[in-house]
Amino acid sequence: MKVFVTGATGYIGGSVSTRLLEQGHEVIGLARSAEAAVALKKRGIEPLTGDINAYTPFVEVVKRVDAVINAANSDNAFVAHALLTGLRGTGKTLIQTSGSSVVGTYDNGEASDDTFDEDTPFTPQPEKAMRVAIDHAVLAAAKENVRAIVIRPALIYGRGIGVSSTSVQLPKLIDVARKHGVPRHVGRGLNIWGHVHIEDVAALYLLALEKASAGSLFYAENGEASFKSVTQSLGRMLGMGDRTQDWPIGEAVEGLGPGAYLSFGSNSRVRAKRSRALGWQPKGRALTDEIENGVYAEVYGRK
């Protein structure tokens, strides 16, 4: 199978691309610079050099491939529109990357008992409304002969196996701990997020590519933890002990940007019911073990 991957130099897209190549698939990857094109070529990926917002190349490249994986920007409606324009009526596959933050609410570090599987309705917060609208537009394309699939990973951790090996949320918390001399969490840190290893995320993409029906939505999670427990684990890895510090939401927004509300202060407790029903069996290293004894200890731990 020939697959076009946007975000092929990124954390998710790069890891998925590596697994696709290992399974014998051909991969075309979007490269936004000459350096990115070289990096993709070195990995056996055919680079398509261009801008993420270039409409015509996206419409044209889908004619050359059997499937598309959009892992570049979950909030970019333009990209989704361009890909769907080229895919409608073809029966080809589009896997759209979303994220479990869409179910988050403004909890400011407090706990919530609410959990969500793929069938649980919810109303997104305003900053996630566009992402959910894109997800719905992709899934609706199943009625227009597109094998449309959406995957919503929880907090992803672990070493990426593509061009980019670095996760997103945890390194930001590590930077905060180093800056202030103590790990910090939004509010009391009682808010809970699901999490999933990057290798398990890549495995779900390949499984969905092989088996999923048109119109399928999948969460990706393999456990959950409060941000207080996550920051305690980071503190132990950094040699700071178990002590953590509450971070008022206003100060957290100043330090982390608006993402502090939903990426670090909300609850995102999802259940990957449909993913497991499809046959997904996550096997990645546990979150605390990866932090304290794995890649994060190797890269960020005390020397």
Describe every region a protein language model picked out:
Residues 285-303:
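Amphipathic terminal alpha-helices
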Residues 204-259, 299-302:
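Mid/C-terminal beta-alpha module of Rossmann-like enzyme folds, strongest
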Residues 198, 228, 254-281:
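Conserved C-terminal active-site "lid" loop/helix of NAD(P)H-dependent oxidoreductases
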Residues 136-161:
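Conserved beta-loop-beta element that borders a ligand/cofactor-binding pocket
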Residues 57, 61-112:
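NAD(P)-cofactor binding segment of oxidoreductase domains
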Residues 158-171, 207-218:
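Glycine/proline-rich active-site loop of Rossmann-fold NAD(P)-dependent oxidoreductases
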Residues 3-25:
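N-terminal Rossmann NAD(P)H-binding glycine-rich loop of SDR-like oxidoreductase domains
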Residues 172-196, 204:
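A conserved pocket-lining segment of Rossmann-fold NAD(P)-dependent short-chain dehydrogenase/reductase
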